[in-house]
Amino acid sequence: MRIPVIRSPLEIRDTERKGRGVFALEPIPAQTCIEISPVLMFSKEEYEQHGQYTVLNEYTYVWSEGKQGLALGLGSMFNHDRHPNVYWKKDNRNNYISYYTLREIKTNEELCISYGDHLWFEDEASSASRISPNEENEDFPLQNISL
């Protein structure tokens, strides 16, 4: 198996409200693959016995057969936004996640994904209209996202 390394114009920065996040160093066109993150897999049993009780639970993706996947690299650094500018696609067979821009990204703009509706923190936009992705499906309905 080979996973390509993406060299995107991105950096990790501290933010005022969200901790660290991923930011663009230059404009990035829409539909650009900005990251391919290998995934560390947790079996269903391992997750149920240990993983769900740790901070790792906040960073894992639902995978096939009850497994949970922890994205490595930038995949674990994208913050949440109810109106994301990045979407992700899982490769179940090869255990990686690809991240793509939904629209053109401006220089110094933070790149964010949607964590869905089951948040473990207070979302500053909680009163805003909600995106309701199927958390089991990495190709959440893009038509529900306003650009």
From Swiss-Prot:
Domain annotation SET: ranges: 8-116
UniProt-listed InterPro entries: SET7_MeTrfase (IPR009207), SET_dom (IPR001214), SET_dom_sf (IPR046341)
One term under GO cellular component: cytoplasm
Impact after mutating Y59A: Abolishes activity
Disruption phenotype: Abnormal sporulation resulting in asci with fewer than four spores and with abnormal spore wall morphology.
Subcellular location(s) of the protein: Cytoplasm; Nucleus
Keyword Nucleus annotated: yes
EC number: 2.1.1.-
Keywords: Cytoplasm, Methyltransferase, Nucleus, S-adenosyl-L-methionine, Sporulation, Transferase
Effect in UniProt of substituting W88A: Abolishes activity
One GO process term, biological-process aspect: methylation
GO molecular function annotation: histone H3K37 methyltransferase activity
SUPFAM superfamilies cross-referenced by the UniProt entry: SET domain
Any matching Pfam family: SET
Reaction(s) this enzyme catalyzes, per UniProt: L-lysyl(37)-[histone H3] + S-adenosyl-L-methionine = N(6)-methyl-L-lysyl(37)-[histone H3] + S-adenosyl-L-homocysteine + H(+); N(6)-methyl-L-lysyl(37)-[histone H3] + S-adenosyl-L-methionine = N(6),N(6)-dimethyl-L-lysyl(37)-[histone H3] + S-adenosyl-L-homocysteine + H(+); N(6),N(6)-dimethyl-L-lysyl(37)-[histone H3] + S-adenosyl-L-methionine = N(6),N(6),N(6)-trimethyl-L-lysyl(37)-[histone H3] + S-adenosyl-L-homocysteine + H(+)
Keyword S-adenosyl-L-methionine: yes
Family to which the UniProt record says this protein belongs: Belongs to the class V-like SAM-binding methyltransferase superfamily.
Function of the molecule: Histone lysine methyltransferase that specifically mono-, di-, and trimethylates 'Lys-37' of histone H3 to regulate sporulation.
Subunit record text: Homodimer.
Name of the featured protein: Histone-lysine N-methyltransferase, H3 lysine-37 specific
Higher taxonomy: Eukaryota, Fungi, Dikarya, Ascomycota, Taphrinomycotina
